[in-house]
Structure formats: C-alpha cells, structure tokens
Amino acid sequence: MERTFIAIKPDGVQRGLVGTIIGRFEQKGFKLVGLKQLKPSRELAEQHYAVHRERPFFNGLVEFITSGPIVAIVLEGEGVVAAARKLIGATNPLTAEPGTIRGDFGVNIGRNIIHGSDAIETAQQEIALWFSPAELSDWTPTIQPWLYE
C-alpha cells in the first residue's frame, strides 16, 4: 500500500491546526501509520530541503522549519501521495482552492501550514529521513473493507 510523508509546519502547530489537519486525512480514509512532534535540527531540515539548496529562499525555509515544533506524519492508502497533494492545495495559499488545507488556513507562501511529498519516490525518501522503521505501525483498520474493493 502506498505511503506519503506529511509535515505540519511550525505555523500550523502554533495556530492549533494539528487535529483539524489530521482529521481531514482520516476523514478521506487514509490510515495514520506514523506520527510524532519534534523540533527539527538544522541538519535534518537541510537534508529534507536539499533539492532547494541553491534557491534564494533556502536559508529562510530552513530557519522557518527549525523555528518551532513540527508534526511529522506518515499516511497510508491507495493513491495517497496524489490525493494528499490535492487535499493540501497549491503551494501559495493565495491561489489555493477553498476547501484545501492551504486554501482554508494558509496566509502566504512562506507560512503555508503543511508539506506533503510530491511523488512516491520522494515520499519513500522523506519517510526514511524522518522516521525509523520502528516508529511506523503496521495495522489494519476495521473500516478497510468499506474503503477498498
């Protein structure tokens, strides 16, 4: 079953949106298999955003993501990577559709509440970076037969 990595950024944590955001994913039918709150080290943040290292916003992004606690999440479900991206919405909250997490709660591109893996391969890398195998739960929800054929 497909998995994705989600991070509720410091602005989402500070604004008390963690439960609401997790609820949206659960209501969609995705299974929570990893969950933890932490204040990322600079090294971890730089590894996570390494693809942006040469971009002008890199240092600001690393400073922001390490400025407070984040909630790291692993979700599981059919098509979860693409579906989670749709639920999250466009990177810029000002252009994100109403009903998406960023459209409903985001303020600006630098404070856009949440990160979600953009591809299956990226999700695998991000999950391995943020979680050890022992931190992930393998379980079967009783509603699974009602979700998947």
Swiss-Prot record:
GO terms for cellular component: cytoplasm. The gene is ndk. SUPFAM superfamilies: Nucleoside diphosphate kinase, NDK. CDD domains: NDPk_I. Major role in the synthesis of nucleoside triphosphates other than ATP. The ATP gamma phosphate is transferred to the NDP beta phosphate via a ping-pong mechanism, using a phosphorylated active-site intermediate. (Microbial infection) Catalyzes the phosphorylation of dZDP to dZTP, when the bacterium is infected by a phage that produces the substrate for the synthesis of dZTP (2- amino-2'-deoxyadenosine 5'-triphosphate), which is then used by the phage as a DNA polymerase substrate. It is found in: Cytoplasm. It catalyses: dZDP + ATP = dZTP + ADP; a 2'-deoxyribonucleoside 5'-diphosphate + ATP = a 2'-deoxyribonucleoside 5'-triphosphate + ADP; a ribonucleoside 5'-diphosphate + ATP = a ribonucleoside 5'-triphosphate + ADP. Disulfide bonds: none annotated. This is Nucleoside diphosphate kinase. The active site is at residue 115. Belongs to the NDK family. One of its GO terms (molecular function) is metal ion binding. One of its GO terms (biological process) is GTP biosynthetic process. It comes from Synechococcus elongatus (strain ATCC 33912 / PCC 7942 / FACHB-805). Coiled coil: none annotated. Its EC number is 2.7.4.6. The keyword Cytoplasm applies. Pathway: Purine metabolism. Homotetramer. It comes from the Bacteria. It holds the Pfam family NDK. Its cofactor is Mg(2+). InterPro entries: NDK-like_dom, NDK-like_dom_sf, Nucleoside_diP_kinase, Nucleoside_diP_kinase_AS. ATP binds at residues 9, 57, 85, 91, 102, 112. Keywords: ATP-binding, Cytoplasm, Kinase, Magnesium, Metal-binding, Nucleotide metabolism, Nucleotide-binding, Phosphoprotein, Transferase.
